């Protein structure tokens, strides 16, 4: 099974040193959108970012960039999903918007998020 990760769960799993649960359970891949690594984790996850970067370098986490999505010929679908999810969930938590949009675009069955609000993105796949 494959999974798209939201920023906060990355931070929670790594702070608890339980990130291997993600890699064991989602044996077909764990992935994030570049904005989650380059903006959200830079701003909110400084204490775990070196461990995350190690797992990215080791191929345990795959980063999807705009260019990679274009190369896969799914960038426009991703862009549409981002716009739709921004309308649904607002721009307050862009990590959440990008995580769900990436899962939808790539056909992942799992979104790992700590969101619990009624009608939140966990209900979107």
Language model: regions and residue ranges:
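Active-site-proximal, substrate-binding regions of enzyme catalytic domains
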Residues: 1-109, 116-125
């Amino acid at each position: 099974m494959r999974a798209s990760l939201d920023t906060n769960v990355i931070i929670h799993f790594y702070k608890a040193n339980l990130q291997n649960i993600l890699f064991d359970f989602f044996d077909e891949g764990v992935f994030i959108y570049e904005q989650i690594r380059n903006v959200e984790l830079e701003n909110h996850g400084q204490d775990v970012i070196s461990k995350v970067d190690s797992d990215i370098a080791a191929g345990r986490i795959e980063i999807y960039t705009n260019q990679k999505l274009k190369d896969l010929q799914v960038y426009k679908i991703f862009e549409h999903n981002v716009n739709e999810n921004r309308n649904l969930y607002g721009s307050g938590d862009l990590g959440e918007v990008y995580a769900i949009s990436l899962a939808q675009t790539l056909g992942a069955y799992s979104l790992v998020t700590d969101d619990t609000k009624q009608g939140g993105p966990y209900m979107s796949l």
